[in-house]
Amino acid sequence: MSVKIRLKRMGSKKRPFYRIVVADSRSPRDGRFITSLGTYNPLTTPKQVKFDEDAVMEWLQKGAQPSDTVRNMLQKAGVMKKYHEAKYAKK
């Protein structure tokens, strides 16, 4: 089972709101997911992104692959840098 960290669209027509979720890569965009990690609201200025950093790190270490959009959000928040430092740290 390939697991992805991606966005699930919520909200109403023309008023999108997204949840950052962990889901099986074969499930549909707005379908079943394993767990919710945070939210993303593109309508606010500045765009509002909230997520549980510890849970995201845990899923990345388990092998979950972030989508391109989620990867960019995590890079801006500094999570991807922490993940790579932890992954390639000298032991």
Curated annotation (Swiss-Prot):
**HAMAP family in the cross-refs:** Ribosomal_bS16
Q: Keywords on this record?
A: Ribonucleoprotein, Ribosomal protein
Enumerate the Gene Ontology biological process terms: translation
Q: Tell me which NCBIfam families the record gives.
A: S16 (TIGR00002)
Q: Which GO terms describe its cellular component?
A: cytoplasm; small ribosomal subunit
What is the name attached to this protein's record?
Answer: Small ribosomal subunit protein bS16
What InterPro entries does UniProt report for this protein, alphabetically? Answer: Ribosomal_bS16, Ribosomal_bS16_dom_sf
Q: Which family does it belong to?
A: Belongs to the bacterial ribosomal protein bS16 family.
Q: Does the keyword Metal-binding apply?
A: no
Molecular function (GO) terms for this protein are: structural constituent of ribosome
